[in-house]
Structures are given as C-alpha cells and as structure tokens.
C-alpha cells in the first residue's frame, strides 16, 4: 500500500535538440541530430523529488531513399545520484539502437515493408530511474527483430 500526496516543489531544467540535413539529392536524404536534457527537482524543504530521470545526451543519424529508410540512435543516460527519499541511485548506461526498412509498393495505396530493428545493441543493464520496478527488474537486454509490415 502506498500513499501519494502533493507537495510544493521547484523543477529546473532544459531540453535541447539540433538537427541538420547534410545530404538531400532527389529521394535520397540524410540528417544528423544531437539532443540532451537535464532536470533538477527539490521539494521546498530541500529533499529531492523521487523518480526524476537523470540527464541524457544523444545523437541520431537518419537516412532515406526512394524505397528504404534507416536510422542509428545512441543515448547516454547519466547516473542519477540525487535520488529521492527511500530511493536508490541509478547507474549510468548507454543505449544504442538501429533500424532499417525496405518498401515494396503493392499498388496505389498499399506497401509492404521488410525491416530489421536492433534495441540495446550494447546489451547494457538498463534501470530506468523513473520506474517503480527499477530495483527489482531491469529493462530487456539486446534485442534484434526482423519483420514484415503491410500498410494500406
């Protein structure tokens, strides 16, 4: 049983993203993005607010052509070393993911997509600080999926 109550708190932080399309020729495009965020939160009595995610910084490269798209995405999640009362700190980790698909047109309004997707490719132990289950169960490890998607 848990009891949740509202308390006065101050949140400070930022979020930023910069994207740049470095190649654009006909149906072929490529871009890069960098991003990051940071949140600090304290109750008015000076205690840390619980389940505040740590800072993160990352980058993504996206590319596409007439019949294909893809991206590679890396995000560094910092250590959460300012946990709230009754919380444990969370270690830092890096997530690397990739995705690519190939489009096969099946007429005027439908297509088939063949895709491959990889998540947590570095097989990091991920404990999402904002999760109530972080101390009991990490997120899933490396996952690679092959698939087929039909779109109308």
List PLM regions with ranges.
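Flexible, surface-exposed loop regions and adjacent strand-edge segments
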Residues: 1, 48-53, 78, 87-91, ...
């Amino acid at each position: 049983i848990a009891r949740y109550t509202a308390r006065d708190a101050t949140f400070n932080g930022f979020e930023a993203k910069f994207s740049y399309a470095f190649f654009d020729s006909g149906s072929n495009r490529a871009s890069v993005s960098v991003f990051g965020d940071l949140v600090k939160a304290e109750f008015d009595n000076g205690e840390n607010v619980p389940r505040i995610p740590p800072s993160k910084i990352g980058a993504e490269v996206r590319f596409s052509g007439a019949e294909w798209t893809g991206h590679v995405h890396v995000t560094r999640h910092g250590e959460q070393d300012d946990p709230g009362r009754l919380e444990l700190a969370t270690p830092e980790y890096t997530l690397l993911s990739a995705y690519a698909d190939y489009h096969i047109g099946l007429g005027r309004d439908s297509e088939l997509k063949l895709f491959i997707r990889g998540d947590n490719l570095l097989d990091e132990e991920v404990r999402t600080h904002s999760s109530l289950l972080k101390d009991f169960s990490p997120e899933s490890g490396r996952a690679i999926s092959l698939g087929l998607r039909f779109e109308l």
